[in-house]
């Protein structure tokens, strides 16, 4: 089959105008949001998976076109870039989404939409010349949407009588002249009225901006997947080890506190606890005031009596040897006083084993 010929797919009935070009866009195919689509749109592989691997698929140079034209069967005529058809202020690769019902059948509502359409139509032929045959079928689908004189003008290309010219800039210029003719869409205007006036400066897609934003969001997601960028959930995943590390630090701190509490010697606490207990109970306070010299060593004999061997207790608390001998002498002195005051030395022996609690006297 010649390079310019393409078989007609479906009946030769004007489906929509050229303004409904987005019906053939892969985004429209993805969410099925476009009414009035009467065929399965084709998908260009370079749109979804850029061959160059870059986010912006740049036009191939004339040398690349000439080398790739050998596989296509003919050398294309050199032409300039289509930058004149598309304003430089607008992004090159963000495809404009035609929404059905917005300015149908004409480009008169905003002239730059026609330039955008022509630039996109030319990009199918110029971005990657190795996809020339696939782009021809796509261009034929776009041309089939033209009505009136535009459809009659595109009929030879659709029938395959005329091949699509390699000089695609000339083709776009001819198409622009046909589309700008006010009589080009007479058949379409007879059926559907244009929702916007011809001289309106408002963009025909203004009511459809939320839909366009959704398409742009999906386009950015597709670019992120193609480029292999890391998902946004990575910062949250990186934050989880930090939380677990803080938990481990807090657990280790608690464990160290428990160790320090267990390792602290017992005799350090009694000087604090007896003062509080003695202040609450008036019984032990009187002998302490009457005998100031014996008030300090009074808790020591009770501890030594509760722990029967006196040599085992001083080892962790007091490693020195002379202190156990002093406590034994004081024990003998205090036992006589306690027998006189309390009268029941056995109850003193049966006091709680905790080093900080003083003996409870039943008389008081």
Curated annotation (Swiss-Prot):
Disordered as annotated region, ranges: 66-88, 258-364
The entry's keywords: Apoptosis, Mitochondrion
Predominant location: mitochondrion
Bias (Pro residues): 311-322, 355-364
Effect recorded for residue 118 to A: Reduces the pro-apoptotic activity and interaction with VDAC1
Expression (tissue specificity): Ubiquitously expressed.
Pfam families tied to this protein: DUF4939 (PF16297)
InterPro entries, A to Z: DUF4939
Compartments, record wording: Mitochondrion
Claim: DNA-binding is one of the keywords in the record: no
Keyword Zinc included in the entry's annotation: no
Record's subunit section: Interacts (via BH3 domain) with VDAC1. Interacts with pro-survival Bcl-2 family members, BCL2, BCL2L1 isoform Bcl-X(L), MCL1, BCL2A1 and BCL2L2. Interacts with BAX and BAK1.
Comment on protein domains: The BH3 motif is required for pro-apoptotic activity and for interaction with pro-survival Bcl-2 family members.
Function statement: Could induce apoptosis in a BH3 domain-dependent manner. The direct interaction network of Bcl-2 family members may play a key role in modulation RTL10/BOP intrinsic apoptotic signaling activity.
UniProt-recorded name of the protein: Protein Bop
Organism whose genome encodes this protein: Homo sapiens (Human)
Classification lineage: Eukaryota, Metazoa, Chordata, Craniata, Vertebrata
């Amino acid at each position: 089959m010649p390079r310019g010929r393409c078989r007609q797919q479906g009946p030769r009935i004007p489906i929509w105008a050229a303004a409904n070009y987005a019906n053939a866009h892969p985004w429209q195919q993805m969410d099925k949001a476009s009414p009035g689509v009467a065929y399965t749109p084709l998908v260009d592989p370079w749109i979804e998976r850029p061959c160059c691997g870059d986010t912006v698929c740049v036009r191939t140079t004339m040398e690349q076109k000439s080398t790739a034209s050998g596989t296509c069967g003919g050398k294309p005529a050199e032409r300039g870039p289509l930058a004149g058809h598309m304003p430089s202020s607008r992004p090159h690769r963000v495809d404009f989404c035609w929404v059905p019902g917005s300015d149908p059948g004409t480009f008169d509502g905003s002239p730059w939409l026609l330039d955008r359409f022509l630039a996109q139509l030319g990009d199918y032929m110029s971005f990657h010349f190795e996809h020339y045959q696939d782009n021809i079928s796509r261009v034929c689908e776009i041309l089939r949407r033209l009505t009136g004189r535009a459809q009659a003008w595109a009929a030879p290309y659709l029938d395959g009588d005329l091949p699509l010219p390699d000089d695609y800039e000339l083709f776009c210029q001819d198409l622009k002249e046909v589309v700008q003719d006010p009589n080009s869409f007479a058949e379409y205007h007879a059926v559907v009225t244009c929702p916007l006036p011809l001289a309106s400066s408002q963009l025909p897609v203004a009511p459809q901006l939320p839909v366009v934003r959704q398409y742009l969001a999906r386009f950015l997601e597709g670019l992120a997947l193609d480029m292999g960028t890391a998902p946004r959930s990575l910062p949250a995943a990186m934050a989880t080890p930090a939380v677990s590390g803080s938990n481990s630090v807090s657990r280790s701190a608690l464990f160290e506190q428990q160790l320090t509490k267990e390792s602290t010697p017992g005799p350090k606490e009694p000087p604090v606890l007896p003062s509080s207990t003695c202040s609450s109970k008036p019984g032990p306070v009187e002998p302490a005031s009457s005998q100031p010299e014996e008030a300090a060593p009074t808790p020591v004999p009770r501890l030594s009596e509760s722990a029967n061997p006196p040599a085992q207790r001083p080892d962790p608390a007091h490693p020195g040897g002379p202190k156990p001998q002093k406590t034994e002498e004081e024990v003998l002195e205090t036992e006589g006083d306690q027998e006189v005051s309390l009268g029941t030395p056995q109850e003193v022996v049966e006091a709680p084993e905790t080093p900080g609690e003083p003996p409870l006297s039943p008389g008081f």
